[in-house]
Structures are given as C-alpha cells and as structure tokens.
Amino acid sequence: MEYVCVLNKIKIKMTTKILTLTFLLAITSIVAMSQVVPTTYRGAFAPAPTPMWTDNWTNWDPQNASYGTPTVTVSGVITSNTTWTKNNVYLLQGTVYVDSLVTLTIEPGTVIRGDANVVISSLVIQRGADIVANGTECNPIVFTSSKAPGSRLRGDWGGIIIEGRALNNLGTNIPIEGIGAAEPRARHGGVSPNDNSGSLTYVRIEFAGFAIAANNEMNSLTLGSVGSGTTIHHVQCSMGFDDAFEWFGGSVNCTHLVAYRTLDDDFDTDNGYSGTVQFALGVKDPAVSDDPAQSTSEGWESDNNGSSPFTLTPKTSAKFYNVTQIGAFRCSSNAGGITQPTAIGFRRGARLRRNTELEIHNSILMNNWRGLVMDADVVANAALGGAAFQNNVIAMDYTFSSTITNATGLALAAENVNGTPAYLTNPANGNNVISTPCDVLVNAWSFTNPDYRPNSAGSGAALSGGDLTPGIQIQTALFAANQTAELLVDIFEIGVGNSNGTVTVTIPVPSGFTLAVPSIATLTSTPTSGTNGTSAFFATPYNNGDWNFSLSGGFVIATSKAGVSIPQFGLSTLGFTIKRNLATPAGTNANLVITVSGGSDSTPANNSANNSLSTY
C-alpha cells in the first residue's frame, strides 16, 4: 500500500509575543514569556477538530519501519561544505565530526543510519559549524539504527550532538558529555547567546544514545551551549538509550518536540540553559527505565549545576509551555484499568533540583509515581519568582493517591518534604490535580495509533478555561490619622484563554476606612463608569475606564463593561484610594479582601487576595 501524506488543513499561525505578568501579594513574582504562542488549552495539543501537530512526520512504531540499504558510508571529519541527498542512504561509522566553518546540508526525506557494529557511531556538529537539516511534514529526515526491522535496540548508535558558543555556567571550553574529555572537537561554550548552529526541523532520531559511564552519556539529541540563532522544531526522539533531549547551557528556543519511549529523562536541562520550549510531548514505556542504582527516569530533570553549592551563573532558567508528559502507569482504556510499570526506575513527572529556576506552565503531567518534586532551594527560588510551576494539571499523582499495589518493592519515600505540596496546591499558582487520569486525553493508551488531544467528554474538560487571580498593590498598610494611600487591584488572567463575559470584583470596605474611586465623587448603588488614569505612587496606569463602580451594603463592586475581556497572560488594573477615617483610633486592625468572579473562570479556588491594615 502506498503511503500518502495528507497535510493538515488547519494551520496555526505562529507569532511572537512578549508578555509580562507581575503578581504583588505577600511576595512579588514576575513571569516573563518570550517566543510563546498564547493558547486556550493546557498540554501539547489543541482539542479536536484541530489535528495533532505530530501528524504525518512522526513514527510511533520505528521498530518495524523499513529503511533503505546504505549506499554511502561516512566516517571521520567533514572538512568542506557537504550535502546529503535523499536519493542516498547514509551510514555513519564511528563518530563523524562536522568541522568548524563547515555546513552540512541534508535534503528532506534523507535517511541516515548509525552503524550499530561500530562503537559510538554519531554525528557531532562542532562550534562554528552548521547543520541545515530541514525536512518537511511529508518528507522528514530520519536518523536511525543500521539494524533490520524487529532487531533494533536502544543505544544502537550514539545520536546527534550540537555544540555552540552560547553561555553556560561552567566555562567557555567545556567537554560535552558522551565523548571523551580529551577530544578537542567535543567542546562547547562561549559568550554569544545568539550563536547560530543551523537548523533541525522535521527530523526523527531513533534508537540512539550511549553511556560511557554514569553521568557521562550521549543522548538522542544533545545540545551544548547552543545559541538562540539556531532553529529547532518538529523533532522526535524515539526509543533512546539515555535522555531524549538534554540541554547543557545555551539559549536555543525549541518547539514541537517529541520524547517517545526513551530510557531515561524526556527533557533534561542543566548548566544555565535559558531557552523557551513550547509544544512538547513525552511518553514513557512502562517496560523500559533507567537503572535506579545509577539514575531514575523522569519527565523533566533540571539542575543548575552538578556539584554543591549549585550557585553557578547564569542559572538554569528555561521555560516550558504546553507540554503533555505521560508517565509509565498505563490505562487499559479511557474507562480505567491502571497497571503499574514493570521497570522499577520511574519516579517523577518533574524533578526540579539543585537550585534550578526552571519554569513549567500550561502543561499536563499524568500517570507518574510522583507528579512534582522540588528541592528546598527550588521552592525558595519559586517564592522569589525564580522558578515556577503554574497553571498545570497533575493527573493521578501516586505520592498522594497510591491505589496501586507496589509489587516491585519500590519505596514511596516521602520526598515532598521541601514544600512542594504547599506550592503545588497554592491557589495563586493555578494548578489542578485530577484523580481520574485515564480519560484526560482522547486515546493516550495506544502506542501505535495514539490521540493525545484533550478529551472534552472526560477529565480533559479541566484542561481549558480561564483563571482570574487578583493581586494587591498598596502604598502603605500602616496608616497615620486621616492618612490616604493609593491602592491598585490587579486582575490577572493566568488561565488557558481570555476572560469571557462579565468580571465582578467585590471589596468589603474595611472597618474604620473609606474606599474611593478616582474621578467618582461619591459611590452609590448605581453603577458609574470609571476613568483611566495613572497611580502617582506606583507610576502605573490603571484601567478604570473599562469598569463600572458601585457601593452596596458596605461592598465596593466593580463590574467589567460589555465587550471588555482580559487577555490570556494579561491583566486589568483597578485604581482606588483608601483612607483611615478621622475617628478611627490607633491600634485598629482591619483586613482588605479582594474577590473576583465571573469571566468564565474555571478555577474559582484562587479568586481572592487580602492584605492586613493597621493604624498608629
């Protein structure tokens, strides 16, 4: 039967938007997002009828794929500009280096096979070299094993290493993992964050990975200090021996990544990696994990650096958005029937440790032993805005709901003693926990014909919807007699869509104080339009012109006007003044409470903020 590639009829226009949210509650947290496409859903895929972006170019069954017999053997060092063409099949024998100042171009549809009979057959793009491997949706470039269908194994060949001249926190001439430290061509690092190593698009990497020793492994795709001038999107790493993707420093931005049934971690970030990753899928194989005596298999593993005190700079600060990470617990169907993995090295959906400042947003972590584990220093970073786990869904975290008999003897240690549960469930972070994971996605349980889109008929309905969260900025919380202070109320939309419909903000007037709206002389029960202005103290504009204000039963009420919508990752700021009444005695304590409702908010648990007031 002839294979026909049917291009998706629905295309998503990729835009670049820089958005900043500032939360001012008990602490200040800043979320800065660059190169991020706003979505109306959590996880890697939009709901149907939008096709999955994995259609056509991925392969869910590479073990049985037929590839051509090699016609060209490549070894040693490529020292001049070279093009590999789709009418040939290339065999990598041993470690093949692309020399500095040399460009390797690979045509769409080309197949490259790593020789499984030669130790560490691999492709290394040196600093200053370029790889231009741009496949297409219908003609992806494939790097795979030299073995015949049915006999391929993880680690049949080494994988791809790209070395750049961007920043890391170890130095400017650092040996890359997976190759001996004495090899001068296996070095990465520099001082050029915008360094360009070429492009890797619509590429599959299969059966790669190699371990020289513990913590010195070659991954399916290893990125050492790769700069933001490099283009990486639509890359599938399948059935690898170590990690699927590992970043050692660098600032490259990536989109549309697939980590499929790899042995160790799906996404590993180290040594100051600072790029942005959006739209990614990680799927575990319950029969294949790392050896827990050496390492454990995670969805994310993130470290700042490998040795205490973990304070090297620049710090690991990558940002991940819209990731679907599926652990090793498998459901027999959407109706249930969960079975535990046979391999014993699986642990966490996300392991954030060693002072990392990694951020994960708008993502799904499901069917793991543990959903999220953060070291104490990472929890501290998050409190200061240096790490984040926000607006995510954890489906069936077995730390808290261990309903599976632990026949393997794996100890469910109390790892989450560092404050992770409190951080995870803090309403301000907008996370949800779902106890019924099997029907979150349309069909996550087929390895050969999956559908990883949200299942709107099941638990996947929780993957979309708005999330309005208030924040308070107040000039002072300690008032002298008759003192007036400026008050700003920020209404953030941190959910997976714009607010929809009327938003209502309710503020009980604190006892002993008067709450007023600039430009409105007297608040009454009749809603009155506000006027936009700028806070003199905070030098911040406020959006009162989008709101009507009234006073009813001791409550100041603000309602958004018709047609006003707070955009995803945006905010609307309301400006007030608050005054201590002349008769209010010293030593008075009061509470300022802000509550927001409406706007199609699907997570009402985090819809209030408060601030203590006192007098002297």
Regions found by a protein language model. Name each.
Residues T502-T504, P508-V556, N611-Y616:
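A surface/secretory-pathway sequence property marking extracellular, secreted
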Residues Q35-T105, D115-G128, G135, P140-D242, ...:
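Extracellular beta-rich repeat passengers
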Residues V489, T573, T577-S602:
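Serine/threonine-enriched low-complexity regions used as flexible
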Residues S550-A586:
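Low-complexity, intrinsically disordered segments enriched in Ser/Thr together with acidic residues
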Residues V77, L478-T484, P567-L571:
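Solvent-exposed, conformationally flexible loop/turn segments
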Residues A477-G512:
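Short beta-strand elements of extracellular/lumenal beta-sandwich folds
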Residues P38, D467-Q473, A480, V517, ...:
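Extracellular/luminal low-complexity Ser/Thr/Pro-rich, glycosylation-prone repeat/linker regions
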Residues M1-V36:
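Bacterial Sec-dependent N-terminal signal peptides
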